[in-house]
Amino acid sequence: MSSKQQAQGRNVVVIGTQWGDEGKGKVVDWLTDHAQAVVRFQGGHNAGHTLIIGDKKTILRLIPSGIMHKDVICYIGNGVVLSPEALFKEIGELEAAGLDVQSRLKISEATTLILPYHVAIDHAREKKRGEAKIGTTGRGIGPAYEDKVARRALRVQDLFYPEKFAEQLRENLEYHNFMLTNYYGAEPVNYEKTLAEAMSYAERLKPMVVDVSSALYAAEQAGQNLLFEGAQGTLLDIDHGTYPYVTSSNCVAGNAAAGSGVGPDSLQYILGITKAYCTRVGAGPFPSELYDHDNPARQDPIGVRLAEVGKEFGSVTGRPRRTGWLDAAALKRSIQINGLSGLCITKLDVLDGLETIRLCVGYNLDGKKLDVLPRGAESVARCEPIYEDFPGWKGTTFGIREWEKLPVEAQNFLRRIEEVAGKPIAMVSTGPERDETILLQHPFQD
């Protein structure tokens, strides 16, 4: 019996353990072969998941990666903030490539909408901050979450009640335009244009809108395997990340339940994705950093090499990523927060050819030794990394599919990561293609 015909389903959550960009899209794509549904539960179109299938590169920002598999249903949960404009742009790109999208995409009626004034606020705020800017993508994600918490957000279901929508939109714009013009010195957002654009999306969205919580419950009762796809990474989590240099949502495994409407007991296997090194986009502390394109003091040649070989540029923004050695002490913090079942190490091949490879196993902070990342950006910024050094390997790991075929030095490096982290490595990604993967423990199987 194939995994898609199991009588009893099993659910897997895929979480980034670093600052995002860990390679979750490729791993989700691989795991989707064993799932009937893929669920996005937080974030918006501020993070791109890059998939390479054959010679085709696809970047998904909002739609779950499972859309590339023709028999898989994709859900956007209540924890997501959704830009209708970005959604239909992405749908158009996928349909132009021959994919059936709208019959397989299901959107929660409780999903918060991103509207033009959220984008305007995002840009105006970053401009006013100047050198102290957070480094947002400028897509309105943060302001939309702010409206949600302030209980003034417009949600997908509101589009189907035009009079109520128009009234709430007018109130929202009175508030946001006051802030835009009087505090930020920016242009106001036009009410009539915003209303007309929003209403134009209502009928197009309606066939895709469902009660996602009930749909997922029914799928579980039918014995289906569900895959929950996280965006960003644990160290960008609004509560547990390097605050305030974080995103505006909870990126941790626990939010897979709240952000999609399932119970915590539905999250049976938590897979944490980590690169074999570290990257970060935008501002914020980074203890093991080697290279920052924008910082003349951070131009270590190995960091430059990691960026070039790893093609470390944001898939949505195109911004160069900062690079550094793998931080196992930060990984331990992610393991604590997420309750990880296993690890997936990605981009191991980027380390090929290095004479020495370093692993951060702790920090010196104000005269004390720590073995786990502290909380708060101020403390993290003062951390001095403690490294263990490992001999590199001469051969290539690119495309290897069996553990035994890895260079011994690579095996030793990976085993030490397991020891420091205290969790087993379930998978190793050795290239961008779906089948360039070493499987040690199958997340969908006991």
UniProtKB/Swiss-Prot annotation:
Tell me the InterPro entries matching this sequence. Adenylosuccin_syn_GTP-bd (IPR018220), Adenylosuccin_syn_Lys_AS (IPR033128), Adenylosuccinate_synth_dom1 (IPR042109), Adenylosuccinate_synth_dom2 (IPR042110), Adenylosuccinate_synth_dom3 (IPR042111), Adenylosuccinate_synthetase (IPR001114), P-loop_NTPase (IPR027417)
- Per UniProt, GTP binds at 20-26, 48-50, 321, 347-349, 429-431
Q: Which SMART domains match?
A: Adenylsucc_synt (SM00788)
What is any one of the record's Gene Ontology cellular component terms? Answer: cytoplasm
User: Has the keyword Cytoplasm been applied to this entry?
Assistant: yes
Catalyzed chemical reaction(s) = IMP + L-aspartate + GTP = N(6)-(1,2-dicarboxyethyl)-AMP + GDP + phosphate + 2 H(+)
Q: Name one Pfam family in it.
A: Adenylsucc_synt
Q: What is this protein called?
A: Adenylosuccinate synthetase
Q: Which residues bind Mg(2+)?
A: D21, G48
Q: Which GO terms describe its biological process?
A: 'de novo' AMP biosynthetic process; IMP metabolic process
